[in-house]
Amino acid sequence: MDRTWVTSMSPNVEAVANPLAAACESGYVPDEIYILGNPGLSSYLDSVTSVLERIVVEYGSKTPEITVTNLDNETEFGRIVEHYRTPVLSAHETDGTVAVDVTPGRKFMSAIAFQAGIQYDADHVFYLYLSEGQFYGRIFPDVPNQALDLIDFQEVF
C-alpha cells in the first residue's frame, strides 16, 4: 500500500522538511511526495527535494518518487486545488494512504490545502505546530520534542 505526502514549497527548507520528519517519526513514511512549486522559489527546489529524500531514506524507506507541480502564477487557484485533489483521490482508488501537509507555503495555499484535505478525505491533514519561536528555522532534530506538536486535523474534526 502506497503512502503519499502532499505539500508546498517554501524558501525556508525547515518549513517543508520538519513536518515530514515529524510524520516519519510518528510512523508515516511516504513512498511518494507531491510538492507545489511557487514562482520565485525554484532555486530552493533542489535543496528541498534532497532533504525530503534524505529524511525518507533515513527512516528506512527507499528514495521516494517526487512530483512537482510548478505554477506560473501563484494565484492559479484551480491548479493549486488540483495539486492536492489528484493525489488524494488517486490514493483512494489504489487503497493507499495520503497525508496533506498544510504547514509550509503562503496562507492562502495552506487554506486551500486544508480545505482539499478535509473535503476530499485525506487520511491525514497535518500541521506541525512549533510552540516556541526561538526554534523557527531550525531543522527537526535540533528542536526539542516538547516544542513540537504534529497535529492531524482529521482527528480534530
Residues of each region from the PLM?
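Long, low-complexity, Lys/Arg-enriched
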Residues: 1-97, 111-157
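Short glycine-rich phosphate-binding loop at a beta-alpha junction
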Residues: 97-103
